[in-house]
């Protein structure tokens, strides 16, 4: 079985140094092939122009997209990429990075966070992905984090940061219509920036812990907007120093 990791244009834009650490880990540990994006020729120049200077050259040197062979598994850190592949490439197996680590790296060094309590924020974009949800919780357990569940967790979540407070990109509607059209009734309702912030502040009142853990960069975008202390799970797994 061959594995190929999609580094994600948006994740790398939002978490440039972290993205490089993950890419280096996968290349050095598994010799894994890395590409940027889940869609051929999608906003190539636009994302090159907004990448942080520290990652720009490596990003440009990374292939934008390579067609997948049937025996190749796509490793994903982005719920958008996952949805696109699940619908546009149903013959290609898709595995979250979190599941891959658990299944293939018995020697992974898990940082110890001292039994700190953190709320887990699930994501609507993969509300029905039980395997990923379980993997995230197991990784948190292995990092000695006490997980606090929300009432609207797992398949009940309707949260994806502020991304659901603006129209869905046309590309998503075309490449993943089940997720972003059929399953999205009542989602992607346009709100002003002021309304988005108010909705996010109201959502964050549900959290029972100081810190929140999410595993979607669209979710963390919303948390960041209102100053909610949070981590992307990748930040916990791949810190600057362990």
Feature-to-residue mapping (PLM):
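Iron-sulfur cluster-binding electron-transfer modules in prokaryotic oxidoreductases
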Residues: 1-242
């Amino acid at each position: 079985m061959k594995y190929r990791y999609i580094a994600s244009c948006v994740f790398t834009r939002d978490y440039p140094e972290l993205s490089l650490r993950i890419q280096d880990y996968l290349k050095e540990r598994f010799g894994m092939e890395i590409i940027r994006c889940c869609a051929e020729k999608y906003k190539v120049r636009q994302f090159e122009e907004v990448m942080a200077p520290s990652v720009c050259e490596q990003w440009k040197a990374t292939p934008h997209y390579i067609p997948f062979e049937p025996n190749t598994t796509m490793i994903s850190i982005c719920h958008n990429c996952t949805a696109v592949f699940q619908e546009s490439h149903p013959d290609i197996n898709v595995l979250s990075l979190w599941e891959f680590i658990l299944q293939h790296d018995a020697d992974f060094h898990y940082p110890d966070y001292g039994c700190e309590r953190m709320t887990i924020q699930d994501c609507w974009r993969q509300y029905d992905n039980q395997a990923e949800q379980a993997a995230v919780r197991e990784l948190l357990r292995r990092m000695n984090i006490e997980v606090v569940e929300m009432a609207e967790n797992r398949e009940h979540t309707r949260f994806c940061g502020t991304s659901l407070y603006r129209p869905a990109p046309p590309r998503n509607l075309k490449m993943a219509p089940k997720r972003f059209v059929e399953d999205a009734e009542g989602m992607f309702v346009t709100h002003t920036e002021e309304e988005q912030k108010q909705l996010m502040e109201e959502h964050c009142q549900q959290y029972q812990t100081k810190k929140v853990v999410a595993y979607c960069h669209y979710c963390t975008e919303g948390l960041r907007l209102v100053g909610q202390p949070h981590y992307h799970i990748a930040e916990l797994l791949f810190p600057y120093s362990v």
